[in-house]
Amino acid sequence: MASGQGPGPPRQECGEPALPSASEEQVAQDTEEVFRSYVFYRHQQEQEAEGVAAPADPEMVTLPLQPSSTMGQVGRQLAIIGDDINRRYDSEFQTMLQHLQPTAENAYEYFTKIATSLFESGINWGRVVALLGFGYRLALHVYQHGLTGFLGQVTRFVVDFMLHHCIARWIAQRGGWVAALNLGNGPILNVLVVLGVVLLGQFVVRRFFKS
C-alpha cells in the first residue's frame, strides 16, 4: 500500500515514528487479511451458537482464508476476544445500527464518525478489537437488509481508517499485528474489553442519536 495521501480523510499526525520492524504500511496491508479472518471466525461462532436464528452471509462463509498464516491466526484470536465483547454489548451494536439505518451511500460516513469517536481519547487493543467488531456488524447488518457484496467495501473502510488515523502506526510500534496473539489472558483481556467498548452505550448514542 502506498504511503502517500490517497482517498479518504487527511492522515493525522501520529507523533513518534513507526518501528522499523513493522512498518505502518505493512500493518495496513496485513489488516485486510486480519479482518477477513476475524469476520470468518466471528460469523462461524454465531452460526454455531444460534443456528437458523442467524442467517448465513454467503460472502462471509466463503471468504478465502489461510488459517495457518500468522495474520489468519491473529484474526481468529481477535474473533475470540470479539466474541466476549459481542456477548456483553451486542444489544448496543444492534440498537446503534437500527437507529442509523446504514446504506451503501452513507455507510462510510457513519463508520468513520463512530470509529473516530471510538478512538477520540486514545488507542488501545480493546478499541482496535471493538473497531473490527463494528466493521463486522456493519457488513452483516447491511447484508441482512438486502445489500449483497458489501463486505469488501467494509474491509476497505477498516484498512483506510487504520492508516489515516494513526492506528496502523500504533500497531506497528508494538511489533505489528502479531502482538495481538498475546492478548487473550485473563485480567489483561478484561481490561481491554472494558476500555474498548465503554463508549457504545454512552458517547456514540449521545452524539449521533440526540443530535
From Swiss-Prot:
Stretches for region Disordered: 1-28
Motif annotated as BH1, chain positions: 117-136
UniProt topology in membrane: Single-pass membrane protein
Keywords: Acetylation, Apoptosis, Host-virus interaction, Membrane, Metal-binding, Mitochondrion, Mitochondrion outer membrane, Transmembrane, Transmembrane helix, Zinc
Subcellular location(s) per record: Mitochondrion outer membrane
Domain of life of the source: Eukaryota
Self-association state and partner proteins as the record states: Homodimer. Formation of the homodimer is zinc-dependent. Forms heterodimers with BCL2 and BCL2L1 isoform Bcl-X(L). Forms heterooligomers with BAX. Interacts with BCL2A1. Interacts with RTL10/BOP. Interacts with VDAC1. Interacts with GIMAP3/IAN4 and GIMAP5/IAN5.
Comment text on domains: Intact BH3 motif is required by BIK, BID, BAK, BAD and BAX for their pro-apoptotic activity and for their interaction with anti-apoptotic members of the Bcl-2 family.
Protein name: Bcl-2 homologous antagonist/killer
Source species: Homo sapiens (Human)
